[in-house]
Amino acid sequence: MAVAHLACDSQGSVVDLSGQGLQKLSPTLPFGNDTQTLILDKNQIIKLEHVEKCRNLVQLSVANNRLVRMMGVAKLIHLRVLNLPHNSIGYVEGLKDLVHLEWINLAGNNLKIIDQINSSTSLQHLDLSDNNISQIGDLSKLKSLKTLLLHGNNIASLRAASACLPQSLTILSLAENEIRDLNEVAFLAGLVDLEQLSIMNNPCVMATPSIPGFDYRPFIVSWCLNLKVLDGYVVSQKESLKAEWLYSQGKGRSYRLGQHIPLVQYLATVCPLTSAHGLQTEEDAKLDKILSKQRLHQKQLLHQTRSDGYLTSSTPNKRLPLSTEHHSPTHVLQTEPTVQVNNWLRSSSSEDHSYAVRNICSSPFGPPHYSSLYMEDIQTDEDKLNCSLLSSESTFMPVAPGLSPVSPTVELRVPAIKADLPVNETVIEFNKDHTELPPSETPEKPKLIPGLSAMQDDKSCCVYPVIKDENVTENIINCETAVSMESTQTSNGPTCHNLIMNCKQASVLDQDVNHINKISKAATKLQSCWRGFYARKYNPKVKDVCYEIRLSRMQEHIVFLTEEVIRLRKEKEEDRIQRILQGEAVRYLWEQVQAIQQWQNTVKLQTANSSENDLPSASNSKHANPALEELPSSPEKLNRKASPDIPDSGFHSVILNHCTMGNTEKNSSEESEYSQPSLDTGRHYNDKVPDSPADQDLTREEQSQSSKDSFTSEQDSSLLQQYLRSVEQLDETADNTSYSERTEESRPEITTCSDNSDLSCSISHFLPENSKQENIDIHSNLPSIDDGHNTPIPCDSSLLVPQPDLV
């Protein structure tokens, strides 16, 4: 196993065993009592063993391993720095005796609670980010704690912050948690020394489609009054003024816990989110006006102090500042626009990490304290709206100077000049391409006016804005105002001449600035077009994004086509089922039609057989009953009654002749009562007096066949009910007509027939079976009604062959 070499420095020995594939620590490893720094990063260590022999160990780093417990550090009582990120540690232990600990990093573990850290009273930095902590533990005994990083956890409430967090806390990171109510920020009001706070990427500050955009920064500043940096951006003067207004006159502190939606709606009205300069509200315009007046007043005071002799003519290379802001160590007023500061790393080196800084011009005759100025990475409001910095990586974690984020509009910042002079915190930018005027055109400036000499000596280092052209005009107006104020103090001729020349130079400067701004805009547009083309063609990340967009569109199209295919398939299935039902219905109707045709053929055959059987029975009754033929009646009228006009429908019904059994004065109801015995008598006579045995058998077969046919026809009788009703109506009409005619023309014949019928019926009813043959002889001996006609006219229509009841 390879062992890393020992590297000793002035502070003691350093043992670096990172990336060696170690799974455990053996006693033979090269570290002893003199080891002060031990680095075991990027190994496979599960348990810390044999590190207690390093009694003087001050710094220990075991990052990116497989540690489950941290009890192995319990005996390292001199330990000051403990770095254990990205392991599998479940709970904090072994820190009870480590009273000298100042820096602990436990990020990226499986911690759920904060415990056993109160004993490390010297702790200043505690990193518990990217764990599973759901609530803030008790850290009130850590009086020296300055930095607490809790981003990337599951914290949903800050109720315990005022009681569990120490008052000395200056940096607090709560980003990427589960805080859903913006009113939870009120519990941070007790942290009076809090200067930097991060609350980004929480549900309470994230934009939603149902809620209009709002700026939460003034509301948080209204609770944390000493806050200087929020979410990685410096709190601007405008935000401070809005926070003061929310605290004093607005409703910022009137909302309580659980009223997140009303608070957000209120902030959307008083602090709307505007990303462009042309979308400023009326309140923003008023604030800008107030701040501009404040800067103008400060300029006037500066000029007044210079004219009084604060700045003499012996310092001709001093510049006229564009804006000056006084500040105290406890409260610093930042100038507009809002800037982003990485204030963990401040380097005095001359390395330039920003491509927006054109040139740094300094006068060789300037004071020596300008050489001690240093640069910081700053960012304007436009970059703040377009950036996606995570506080856990870019804001609260130190990075190397060469890897610091670069902003396209980074400017030079001068935080301090000298203790005995007002501090200038104006964001300025120098242009090295500015051409100086020829010396011949510059008039000789008198030494009586120090302000003018300072202005004219400043031509070699011109100030240009980055964002707005209005700033240049305002600066020129301020310059003219300052010149006019100083001109009132003198009355000589050269001073007026110098004022005129200064105004001309200001106008020329304005034209040059406009021309340069146009060129800059054109160059920026060309660069943006080229960068877009290059990114789309050669940048792998952009190509991957374009590929993902194409895949997403293709997926959406496939989903749409799938839905269409499913819909068409359902429609086709419904059409198929409908066609099947229609086919079944047509088949059923065809079967019904076939059944009706078969039944019609059966009825026709039955009718034909009945008509053939009627003829022999009628002839037999004529020969057997000659006396009945002699009854006085009109054959034409009887035939007209027996066969009325019935439409030929294929279903012939036999009309029974009812003989009247009473006098002509009786009504139709009495005649119907007498017709029933006559019908029974006729049937009885027909049954008892057959012509021959063969005819009797044929009659019985026909009756049984007709009964079967009638039973079969009952199933389809409903189809003929309407037709038979119409036939019955015609029959009743014909019966009434024929009956009225017969009663008037042949009343004696009907009476005689009725008497004879009653006599024969009564005789046949009371005679025994052996005497019924004699009754037949009696009827045969009766005289014929009409010898001239061969058609037999029976007394009752029941003598015919009975037909089946079709209804």
UniProtKB/Swiss-Prot annotation:
Question: What Gene Ontology cellular-component terms does the record carry?
Answer: centrosome; cytoplasm
Q: Spell out the Polar residues composition-biased ranges.
A: 607-623, 704-724
Which segments constitute the IQ domain?
519-548
InterPro entries the UniProt entry points to: Cilia_flagella_integrity, Leu-rich_rpt, Leu-rich_rpt_typical-subtyp, LRR_dom_sf
Q: Does the keyword Repeat apply?
A: yes
Taxonomy, superkingdom = Eukaryota
The UniProt entry, under SMART domains, shows:
LRR_SD22 (SM00365), LRR_TYP (SM00369)
Where does the UniProt annotation locate this protein? Answer: Cytoplasm, Cytoskeleton, Microtubule organizing center, Centrosome
The record's region (Disordered) falls at 306-330, 607-756
Role: Acts as a key negative regulator of ciliogenesis in collaboration with ccp110 by capping the mother centriole thereby preventing cilia formation. Required for recruitment of ccp110 to the centrosome.
Q: Which PANTHER family match?
A: CENTROSOMAL PROTEIN OF 97 KDA (PTHR45973:SF2), PROTEIN PHOSPHATASE 1 REGULATORY SUBUNIT SDS22-RELATED (PTHR45973)
Q: What name does UniProt use for this protein?
A: Centrosomal protein of 97 kDa
